[in-house]
Amino acid sequence: MTTVRTRIAPSPTGDPHVGTAYIALFNYCFAKQHGGEFILRIEDTDQLRSTRESEQQIFDALRWLGIEWNEGPDVGGPHGPYRQSERGEIYARYAKQLVDAGHAFYCFCTAEELEQMRAEQMARGETPRYDGRALLLSDEEVQRRLAAGEPHVIRMKVPSEGICVVPDMLRGDVEIPWDRMDMQVLMKNDGLPTYFLANVVDDHLMGITHVLRGEEWLPSAPKLIKLYEYFGWEQPKLCYMPLLRNPDKSKLSKRKNPTSVTFYERMGFMPEAMLNYLGRMGWSMPDEREKFSLAEMVEHFDLSRISLGGPIFDIEKLSWLNGQWLRELPVEEFAARVQKWAFNSDYMMKIAPHVQGRVETFSQIAPLGGFFFEGALKLDAKLFESKKLSADQVRQVMQLILWKLESLRQWEKERITGCIQAVVEALELKLRDAMPLMFAAITGQASSVSVLDAMEILGPDLTRYRLRQALDLLGGVSKKENKEWEKLLANIA
């Protein structure tokens, strides 16, 4: 009997997302319910954005939740390497195989040519897509341009008409017209694969039998199916999971909800409760109970109990469930978890240097630095009153800083300062005009330890959460303001 093998393949390009944890949980439960194996693979072909720090955060977040893997970059296994950046020769070999078989072709089009092609198609009211012009090149010209070292990509051929039937374990057969598919790039001009080629090659070579992924990938499923057909490989069973939603039914995004697993750990949520809540996202136990452990979910896991309606990720409901778990802890374990969460030596050593020189007794630490141990702050709107800025300017400054911080890849004091400086300069203000607002939003006080040091210590998730909290207190941002300020943001270096 074939061993069930599932996987999660996140990209290490930012904070570990709750959506990644959600898909990982369901892949894990499906594999373990069938006595199978769960694999972690790192999709790090985006060399500009991928970092080992983000990769380690993925490891830490999944392990904090209690999700372990049988094979992966850090534990090894018989199907490695498990980082796509280390599998370049493998992808190149299979891409060449597709070209030789006539299923793919070399494309030498420049970015300017592709942009012109797109503009002309849109002007004609057509859906922008590659027009296949490289297919008209003779073999001799292709070889000449390759020999000359001309930059190129490899694209796959796709049918121009007909229907592709996608067998989905949740929806049954889904029909998608081929004329919606573009001639997908498989190998980029830097020699690295795109998601589509790497995904198919890796899943096949790693023996993946079932793929549970987000439903946002369903429209592009025909490309993957066609690649399996081109290679002559058996396709894994496919399951397209419903996407997590904000309370307003929009797709879960960090602009409306904290999306990082690290944020919920820092806020003091229990990993058991977090997993429990993610397990209830579109799935339910046979007896409909709300509170259950990972082991209980594995024992009763059945894909037929997944609902296709977009599950709502609601922090208030998560908090309620966390309270159920927390209150059932033995007092000794409760105390131990509190100490591990807030008063562990690593965290205290980050805070101590900034507090020690400002107090005369230990009892003064809490009033000065208590915000380091809080999640949501009790804010006073009076703290945001400015002699220099109008109420609208206050909100504008804070919103633009929040947006700039959302784009920050490396969370360091110098870079945080740079974001704030860029905003105030664009608005022709001084740094001293913005810093009182930062003190108020981040510490809940008019003054404290260096707010820039505090932001670095608190981390990106909690910092951005508190800025959003402050903006909500001040009335939020209207749709008109949002549109106008985003245009302004685009011009801020």
Curated annotation (Swiss-Prot):
Role: Catalyzes the attachment of glutamate to tRNA(Glu) in a two-step reaction: glutamate is first activated by ATP to form Glu-AMP and then transferred to the acceptor end of tRNA(Glu).
This protein's record includes keyword Nucleotide-binding: yes
Disulfide partners: none
Any GO molecular function: tRNA binding
Highest taxon in the source lineage: Bacteria
Homology family: Belongs to the class-I aminoacyl-tRNA synthetase family. Glutamate--tRNA ligase type 1 subfamily.
Major localization listed first in the record, in broad terms: cytoplasm
Localisation: Cytoplasm
Record flagged with keyword rRNA-binding: no
Keyword annotations: Aminoacyl-tRNA synthetase, ATP-binding, Cytoplasm, Ligase, Nucleotide-binding, Protein biosynthesis
Example GO BP: glutamyl-tRNA aminoacylation
Quaternary data: Monomer.
Reaction equation(s) it catalyzes: tRNA(Glu) + L-glutamate + ATP = L-glutamyl-tRNA(Glu) + AMP + diphosphate
InterPro entries attached to this UniProt entry: aa-tRNA-synth_I_cd-bd, aa-tRNA-synth_I_codon-bd_sub2, aa-tRNA-synth_I_CS, aa_tRNA-synth_I_cd-bd_sf, Glu-tRNA-ligase_bac/mito, Glu/Gln-tRNA-synth, Glu/Gln-tRNA-synth_Ib_cat-dom, GluQ/Sye
Chain positions of motif 'KMSKS' region: 251-255
Assigned GO CC terms: cytosol
UniProt motif 'HIGH' region: location: 10-20
Coiled coil segments of this chain: none
EC number: 6.1.1.17
Binding site for ATP: 254
Name of the protein described by the UniProt record: Glutamate--tRNA ligase
